[in-house]
Curated annotation (Swiss-Prot):
Assigned keywords, A-Z: GTP-binding, Hydrolase, Metal-binding, Nucleotide-binding, One-carbon metabolism, Zinc
Protein name per its UniProtKB record: GTP cyclohydrolase 1
GO molecular function ontology, one term from the record: GTP cyclohydrolase I activity
NCBIfam families with a match to the protein in the record: folE, PRK09347.1-2, PRK09347.1-3
Record: residues binding Zn(2+): 75, 78, 146
Pfam families reported for this sequence: GTP_cyclohydroI
Quaternary structure and partners: Homomer.
Natural source organism: Streptococcus pneumoniae (strain ATCC 700669 / Spain 23F-1)
One GO biological process term: tetrahydrofolate biosynthetic process
Length: 184
């Protein structure tokens, strides 16, 4: 990541909105923003393979559900945050991931400029590809600051997105069971 370019760009934005980039409260802002971007965009170019490839053998194929995984990310359209909770269900095929690995999977894909629909897809596809799940179902509910603080200005509005892979695509009863276990 080119932090010098980020700092220069932030300084230009500060000046472009009519502020003094040398004012006491703004002097360090370009460097702070560059450090923040290094942190919140640390998922760029990464996948969840390293997390999901560490799995444990299991005999049965009962559904695994982890819900209320908090995340935050940046909307790629306005570079404003959106945040919320991810709910994940999957059907193992002989292997299960450690519970923290599901949260880490959400984290990897949320640490980059993102849209909610793609975040759903990337998490579900990672479970299928790297864990070898028989099915994956991901529900994300989030509040978007680009809707809350600008434009339509409707704070508190939740957007829900879902994606189903494998067995969840074809089995409505399985999806319904996942919804119930997620409390949705």
């Amino acid at each position: 990541m080119d932090t010098q370019k980020i700092e220069a760009a932030v300084k230009m934005i500060i000046e472009a909105v009519g502020e003094d980039a040398n004012r006491e409260g703004l002097q360090e802002t370009p460097a702070r923003v560059a450090r923040m971007y290094q942190e919140i965009f640390s998922g760029l170019g990464q996948t969840a393979e390293e997390h999901l490839s560490k799995s444990f053998e299991i005999i049965d194929d009962n559904m695994v559900v982890e819900k209320d995984i908090f995340f935050h990310t940046m909307c790629e359209h306005h570079f404003l945050p959106f945040y919320g909770r991810a709910h994940i269900a999957y059907i193992p095929d002989g292997r299960v991931a450690g519970l923290s690995k599901l949260a880490r999977t959400v984290e990897v894909y949320s640490k980059k400029p993102q849209i909610q629909e793609r975040l759903n897809i990337e998490v579900a596809d990672a479970l299928m590809e790297y864990l070898g799940a028989k099915g994956a179902f991901v529900v994300i509910e989030a509040e978007h600051m680009c809707m809350s603080m600008r434009g339509v200005r409707k704070p508190g509005t939740a957007t829900l997105t879902t994606v189903a892979r494998g067995l969840f695509e074809t089995d409505k009863d399985l999806r319904d069971q996942a919804y119930r276990l997620m409390g949705l």
